[in-house]
């Protein structure tokens, strides 16, 4: 009897033990399965993050290994004007595209060619020349180095050269708006304009500005001067002071570094100055009425991006009021609100083609007569 009871007890114990083992094995398998699934998910998540990180790095460094350099004109990289704007655009390209960026300053015209050659010798992928004054040097270097890509601001004389991209601007359009503001702002019916050089390119500023002044104020007189330099602040200041003596109470400087002297003279005389190329209000906030902006920074960034994308094809690229390649500075606190509204309407007319702004001698004189002297 005891044997039968013990046998039954033993059988029951073995059954319970087997059941427990079965449950333990099942739980172990389920635990292992869950762990594997979790590991797979974690692995997938890590892979996705790695891919995203890889893509981000790819986007940020798509220009890695590419070198872009700018050669300034004699105004230098701190001219507060288009050389500085060009460098700011290239710095943006360095940050956003991952390119290597560098500038070389030209102290005299004789520096243009050797500066370009320095970048060629250092195997730069794109060399950007800032200003029409570099055109002759670029012509020689682009011919001698057909495999190197070049760009130049404010010159289209090399438009047919396949490895040169010309970056042009409708500066007469924005100069017209600046002139209109000047004509509406002057209290003495006398305003001025100071050019760094009286070339065809620079005279486009003069035609637009003078046209804007006269359309705003038919009684206004426009004093005009050629400083004959983009890097002589003393001459800029003397020239502006002469205009102040002759009654000017608004002066538009289109003279690079020389123009800083113009602004200084206006500040001392407590009259208005109009800046050029970039927003120059930070130089003298209570003196700068507005600035005729030319977005050289955007042009330099754009051609750098085209290099990275493999789309630099040469030819001419022109920036206008329609694509905000030129415009007045955004700050309007020094301009009469009524004039701001009038300027906004003028912008629409220029963009639509209803208002044609003269950018050459023939078109200017056809409407306004022979009142612009710097083209003689």
PLM feature segments, named:
Residues 23-376:
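A residue-level marker of the well-folded mature domains of exported/periplasmic proteins
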Residues 12-13:
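Repetitive helical segments and hydrophobic/amphipathic motifs
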Residues 1-9:
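Positively charged n-region of N-terminal signal peptides that target proteins for export
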Residues 4, 22-23:
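N-terminal helix-turn-helix DNA-binding module of bacterial transcription factors
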Residues 17-20:
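C-terminal motif of bacterial Sec signal peptides marking the signal peptidase cleavage site
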């Amino acid at each position: 009897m005891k044997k039968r009871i013990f046998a039954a007890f033993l059988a029951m114990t073995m059954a319970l033990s087997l059941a427990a083992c079965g449950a333990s094995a099942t739980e172990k398998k389920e635990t292992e399965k869950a762990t594997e699934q979790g590991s797979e998910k974690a692995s997938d998540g890590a892979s996705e993050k790695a891919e995203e990180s890889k893509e981000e790095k790819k986007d940020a460094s798509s220009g890695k290994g590419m070198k872009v350099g700018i050669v300034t004109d004699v105004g230098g990289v701190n001219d507060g004007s288009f050389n500085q704007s060009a460098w700011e655009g290239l710095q943006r390209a360095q940050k956003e595209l991952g390119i290597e960026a560098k500038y070389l300053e030209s102290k005299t015209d004789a520096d243009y060619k050797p500066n370009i050659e320095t970048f060629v010798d250092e195997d730069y992928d794109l060399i950007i020349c800032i200003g029409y004054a570099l055109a002759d040097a670029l012509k020689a270097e682009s011919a001698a180095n057909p495999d190197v890509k070049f760009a130049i601001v404010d010159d289209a004389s090399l438009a047919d050269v396949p490895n040169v991209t010309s970056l042009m601007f409708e500066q007469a359009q924005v100069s017209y708006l600046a002139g209109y503001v000047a004509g509406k702002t002057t209290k003495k019916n006398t305003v001025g304009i100071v050019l760094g050089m009286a070339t065809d390119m620079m005279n486009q500023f003069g035609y637009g500005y003078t046209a804007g002044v006269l359309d705003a104020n038919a009684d206004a007189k426009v004093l005009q001067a050629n400083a004959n330099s983009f890097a002589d602040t003393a001459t800029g200041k003397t020239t502006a002071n002469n205009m102040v003596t002759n009654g000017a109470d608004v002066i538009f400087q289109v003279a690079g570094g020389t123009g800083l002297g113009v602004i200084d003279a206006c500040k001392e005389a407590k009259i208005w100055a109009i800046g050029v190329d970039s927003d120059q209000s930070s130089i003298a906030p209570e003196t700068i009425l507005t600035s005729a902006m030319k977005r050289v920074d955007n042009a330099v960034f754009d051609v750098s991006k085209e290099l990275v994308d493999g789309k630099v094809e040469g030819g001419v690229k022109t920036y206008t009021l329609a694509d905000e390649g030129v415009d007045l500075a955004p700050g309007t606190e020094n301009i009469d609100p009524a004039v701001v509204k009038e300027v906004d309407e003028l912008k629409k007319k220029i963009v639509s083609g209803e208002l044609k702004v003269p950018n050459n001698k023939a078109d200017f004189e056809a409407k306004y007569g022979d009142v612009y002297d710097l083209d003689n």
